[in-house]
């Protein structure tokens, strides 16, 4: 899918915009040559295996990590500009809350630290889960603590909410409740959400935008509704026990040969042979194919990429 977005799009249209972004540690590059854009008002799934660079990317967006190369902007403003701080909220997997504080004290702390605090929204989120305001945070269940953490995040009224595996420790019922809460609050406020998660089905239900990272590089970026139809799952019979030469005319993400039958995830660059069976893959199948094949050519949908100099990239 080529990038055909208009050159006069304003930077404010992009919640996050990276150009040539990279981070190197002693052991090597955690992220390298990352250029992408996430539109404002979207719920973006950040996908990748352990060690892919997801947490590093979120760390760069929250100024917890300093980049080695490149540039990262939040709503068109450099991420290290103090003006960005009130616009961004971050919720990590460990949800660092003061266990000796009561829920009420925790929300009061949020009000004192954030000038634009929305007490009504924070209290609404807590009350919806029947969380006792007088209970100490350390006595709450995992689902209740997560709800309090979400209340702190949304009470800040951020324009950009960054979530690092926020629901990994929840049971299925609590996870469903938090997912519903997240989507409702994001839609109501127009908040841009970037959420890292290993749960592909969860992302499929919630996210309308995707950023796929593998081995420190961007593998896919763009609208979920455009990324999936760009792929076709083909199955056919091998004539000589090897992959058919016709595959070379298409972008092959992943292929496998079992006996005399082959199967491949491709991005067609023209008509496919009539004797091949064709099916549209699920989002999960597309993501897994790209994660298993980090050397496959990357894919960006319209507007999702700029090059390191900030110009449109095809």
Q: In which residue ranges do the predicted regions lie?
A:
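The feature captures the beta-strand-to-loop junction immediately N-terminal to the Walker
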Residues: 47-49
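ABC-family P-loop ATPase nucleotide-binding domains
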Residues: 93-148
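Catalytic Walker B motif of ABC-type/P-loop ATPase nucleotide-binding domains
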Residues: 161-165, 170
């Amino acid at each position: 899918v080529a990038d055909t977005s208009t050159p006069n799009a304003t930077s404010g249209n992009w919640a996050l915009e990276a150009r040539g972004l990279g981070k190197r540690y002693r052991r090597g590059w955690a992220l390298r040559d990352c250029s992408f854009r996430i539109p404002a008002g979207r719920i973006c799934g950040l996908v990748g295996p352990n060690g892919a660079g997801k947490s590093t990317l979120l760390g760069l967006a929250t100024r917890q990590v300093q980049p080695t190369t490149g540039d990262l902007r939040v709503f068109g403003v450099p991420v290290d500009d103090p003006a960005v701080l009130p616009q961004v909220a971050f919720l990590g997997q460990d949800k660092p809350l003061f266990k000796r504080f009561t829920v009420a004290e925790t929300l009061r702390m949020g009000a004192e630290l954030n000038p634009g605090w929305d007490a009504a929204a924070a209290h609404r989120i807590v009350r919806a889960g029947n969380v006792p305001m007088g209970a100490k945070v350390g006595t709450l269940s995992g689902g209740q603590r997560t709800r309090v953490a979400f209340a702190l995040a949304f009470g800040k009224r951020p324009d950009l909410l960054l979530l690092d595996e926020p629901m990994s420790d929840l049971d299925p019922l609590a996870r469903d409740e938090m997912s519903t809460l997240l989507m409702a609050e994001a839609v109501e406020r127009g908040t841009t959400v970037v959420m890292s998660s290993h749960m592909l089905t969860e992302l499929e239900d919630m996210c309308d935008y995707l950023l796929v990272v593998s081995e420190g590089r961007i593998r896919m970026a763009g609208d979920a509704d455009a990324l999936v139809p760009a792929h076709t799952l083909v199955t056919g019979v091998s004539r000589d026990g090897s992959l058919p030469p016709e595959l070379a005319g298409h972008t092959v993400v992943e292929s496998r040969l079992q006996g005399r039958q082959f199967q491949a995830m491709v991005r067609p660059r023209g008509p496919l042979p009539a004797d091949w069976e064709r099916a549209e893959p699920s989002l999960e199948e597309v993501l897994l194919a790209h994660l298993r094949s980090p050397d496959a050519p990357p894919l960006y949908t319209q507007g999702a990429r700029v090059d390191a100099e900030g110009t449109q990239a095809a």
